[in-house]
Amino acid sequence: MDVFMKGLSKAKEGVVAAAEKTKQGVAEAAGKTKEGVLYVGSKTKEGVVHGVATVAEKTKEQVTNVGGAVVTGVTAVAQKTVEGAGSIAAATGFVKKDQLGKNEEGAPQEGILQDMPVDPDNEAYEMPSEEGYQDYEPEA
């Protein structure tokens, strides 16, 4: 029985040693896993931060591009509006053809009313008769 007890004792020591090694191995593996997870997490966070920064920068660039296009479009619309108003003024006789496109000093203004067709015979503006008009009474 002594041999049997000695064998069981040795087996127990082996199991304890194996358990210690397993515990140590599991702890080491857990530590490495934790390091790996933290590393991946930090790299993912860096990637997300970089990605968000990149998206924000691209959005800013696109807004700048769109803003520039809007300003350019508004400028073009304003220019065409001025040209159209000048055409109407000349065609109706509000302004004489030789007065169009000149600033206060009498110098021609650039970009206004270029190649505008004007009827040179229409020098005066006549008011239409009032027979076809009705007075407007706003509703209260």
Swiss-Prot record:
GO terms for biological process: chemical synaptic transmission; regulation of dopamine secretion; synapse organization; synaptic vesicle endocytosis. The keyword Secreted applies. Gene3D superfamilies: Helix hairpin bin. Residues 111-140 are annotated as: Interaction with SERF1A. Cu cation binds at residues 2, 50. Soluble monomer. Homotetramer. A dynamic intracellular population of tetramers and monomers coexists normally and the tetramer plays an essential role in maintaining homeostasis. Interacts with UCHL1. Interacts with phospholipase D and histones. Interacts (via N-terminus) with synphilin-1/SNCAIP; this interaction promotes formation of SNCA inclusions in the cytoplasm. Interacts with CALM1. Interacts with STXBP1; this interaction controls SNCA self-replicating aggregation. Interacts with SNARE components VAMP2 and SNAP25; these interactions allows SNARE complex assembly and integrity. This is Alpha-synuclein. It comes from Erythrocebus patas. The gene is SNCA.
